[in-house]
Swiss-Prot record:
Entries under CDD domains matching the protein: EFh_CREC_RCN2 (cd16224)
Repeat keyword on record: yes
Signal peptide segment: 1-22
Family: Belongs to the CREC family.
One GO MF term: calcium ion binding
Positions contributing to Ca(2+) 3 binding: 229, 231, 233, 235, 240
Tissue specificity field: Expressed by the venom gland.
Protein name, as recorded: Reticulocalbin-2
Subunit description: May bind phospholipase A2, since the rat reticulocalbin-2 has been isolated on the phospholipase complex taipoxin columns.
PROSITE patterns xrefs: EF_HAND_1 (PS00018), EF_HAND_2 (PS50222)
């Protein structure tokens, strides 16, 4: 089961429900953008001089060739770095919660206690009569299978690297086949090894009284046909499924870099100077380039000696 923090981040990166992959997400309030109420309060207490000082250090770290400008490639690379840093930090925080005995490993029992306050064990081949209980049993078994797959060395415990793969399988190459299979089990209703457009849309059926599909269906169909179905055969193969269930962080980062250039490049040279960024400080802070402002509170990003 993916952690809420990861789900939130992925929704931000993907633009949220009902948003096209190529469409930039709408504005979010300061609390969401800066990572929480504590971060908002801390940032509001900084003087304008301190805000700009921290921001300038981050700008200098993005500027790999030290020419005083940020290119699309430099912005994209930094955003990917920002994303990975967030994932590692999130996994570390989660790991501390799950590792109840502090031995540096997480057992299946510890995972259950943290998630459900008790150890749960369902029979894999038993179907429960109660629909809600059966739905929960299925989710629990999916968690168990993911835990077992992440347990690369088979010792029944997850070390930190394995736990990170369990929490964020999209970041672990050895989890790809499992994620594809998991997706097929969920969406491939006819068992043909592919996901059709109807299976992709799930249980949606147009209201007989409606003259046209709702906007979100139009958007999802467009994503299916133009972003995921590369060979245009009307269905998603296991390889094509990866672009849906395991989005390419490189592509997402490039989209954000292009967006920043489109919005902030005042002289049209397709690169950003420090002055252009400082003149659009709020936009830059509210982007993946600063992890929605979190980097201004993380010394590993803005401390000049690092």
């Amino acid at each position: 089961m993916e952690s809420p923090t990861l789900l939130g981040l992925l929704l931000l990166l993907l633009g949220g429900p009902g948003t096209s992959l190529g469409e930039h997400r709408p504005d979010y309030d300061k609390e969401a953008l800066l990572g929480g109420q504590d971060e908002v309060e801390e940032f509001s207490k900084l003087s304008p001089e301190e805000q700009q000082k921290r921001l300038k250090v981050i700008i200098s770290r993005i500027d790999v060739d030290l020419d005083g400008f940020l290119t699309e490639a430099e912005l994209s690379s930094w955003i990917q770095h920002s994303f990975k840093s967030y994932i590692i930090e999130d996994a570390k925080q989660q790991f501390q919660h799950y590792d109840k005995d502090g031995d540096g490993r997480v057992s299946w029992e510890e995972y259950n206690i943290q998630m459900y306050d008790r150890v749960i064990d369902f029979e894999e081949d038993t179907t429960l009569d109660d629909a809600e209980e059966e739905s929960f049993r299925q989710l629990h078994l999916k968690d168990k299978k993911r835990f077992q797959k992440a347990n690369k060395d088979g010792d029944s415990h997850l070390d930190f690297e394995e736990f990170a793969a369990f929490e964020h399988p999209e970041e672990a190459d050895y989890m790809k086949e499992f994620v594809i299979q998991e997706s097929l089990e969920e969406h491939d209703k006819d068992g043909d090894g592919f996901v059709s457009l109807q299976e992709f849309l799930g249980d949606y059926r147009r209201d007989p009284a409606a003259k046209e599909d709702p906007e979100w269906i139009v958007v999802e169909e467009d994503r299916f046909k133009n972003d995921y179905d590369k060979d245009k055969d009307g269905k998603l193969s296991p390889k094509e499924l990866l672009t849906w269930v395991m989005p390419n962080n490189e592509g997402l980062a490039q989209e954000e870099a292009v967006h920043l250039l489109d919005e902030m490049d005042l002289d049209g040279d397709r690169r950003l100077s420090a002055n252009e960024i400082l003149e659009n400080q709020d936009l830059f802070l509210n982007s993946e380039a600063t992890d929605y402002g979190r980097q201004l509170h993380d010394k590993s990003f803005y401390h000049e000696e690092l």
